[in-house]
């Protein structure tokens, strides 16, 4: 795989993280630049590791993983989306009672893992090609880090304009991403038969 194909693959795989980080930035109402960098690093790390995991597993058990990865991604994104929608209806007093640091880290890491499962599936496929998996994974991770950081910064300016609706819209977008992943895999499965 040449450099251009690798960059296009990296950009395509970073789009879910970009959309999810826009939602997170909008829901946080003016996150700091440090939070945007942190989000980018977490998404980038997850997106860089999962193709390596997929590539390793592709050498051994590709058939079993491909059958379930889309269901796992859909379930995680659906649950996170529902949680964001529920959060959008909470009052400020109810939100103050929660530990925001712990809550945000758990949700952020779970979202990063859920949006990177498609990269694991790609890694499985890359196991059957002549490709330098380390360079490819680094390109995917770097592109995702950049796109997720940009997404947070874009969300920072969208959030105040949307108010409480930002979390509601973010939750709906995460659910839509989950359904998109599920339908793409089910559609491919239908054509394979």
From Swiss-Prot:
Q: Which GO terms describe its molecular function?
A: manganese ion transmembrane transporter activity
The protein's topology relative to the membrane is: Multi-pass membrane protein
Which UniProt keywords are present, listed alphabetically? Cell inner membrane, Cell membrane, Ion transport, Manganese, Membrane, Transmembrane, Transmembrane helix, Transport
Record-linked InterPro entries: MFS_trans_sf (IPR036259), Mntp/YtaF (IPR003810), Put_MntP (IPR022929)
Which parts pass through the membrane? 3-23, 41-61, 65-85, 106-126, 133-153, 169-189
| Gene Ontology cellular-component annotations | plasma membrane
Where does this chain mainly localize?
membrane
State where the protein is found: Cell inner membrane
Matches recorded under Pfam families: Mntp
Task: Identify its protein family.
Answer: Belongs to the MntP (TC 9.B.29) family.
What job does this protein perform? Probably functions as a manganese efflux pump.
Indicate what this protein is called per its UniProt record: Putative manganese efflux pump MntP
């Amino acid at each position: 795989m040449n450099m251009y194909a690798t960059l296009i693959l990296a950009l395509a795989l970073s789009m879910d993280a970009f959309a999810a980080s826009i939602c997170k930035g909008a829901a946080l109402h003016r996150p700091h630049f440090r939070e945007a960098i942190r989000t980018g690093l977490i998404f980038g790390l997850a997106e860089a590791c999962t193709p390596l995991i997929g590539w390793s597993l592709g050498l051994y058990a590709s058939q079993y993983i491909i059958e379930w990865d889309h269901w796992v991604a859909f379930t995680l994104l659906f649950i996170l989306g529902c949680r964001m929608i529920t959060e959008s209806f909470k009052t400020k007093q109810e939100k103050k009672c929660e530990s925001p640091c712990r809550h945000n880290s758990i949700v952020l890491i779970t979202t990063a893992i859920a949006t990177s499962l498609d990269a694991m599936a790609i890694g499985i496929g890359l196991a059957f090609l002549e490709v330098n998996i380390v360079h490819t994974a680094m390109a995917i991770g770097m592109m995702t880090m950049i796109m997720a950081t940009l997404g947070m910064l874009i969300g920072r300016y969208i959030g105040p304009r949307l108010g409480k609706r930002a979390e509601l819209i973010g939750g709906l977008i995460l659910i839509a991403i989950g359904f998109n992943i599920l339908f793409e895999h089910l559609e491919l499965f239908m054509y394979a038969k």
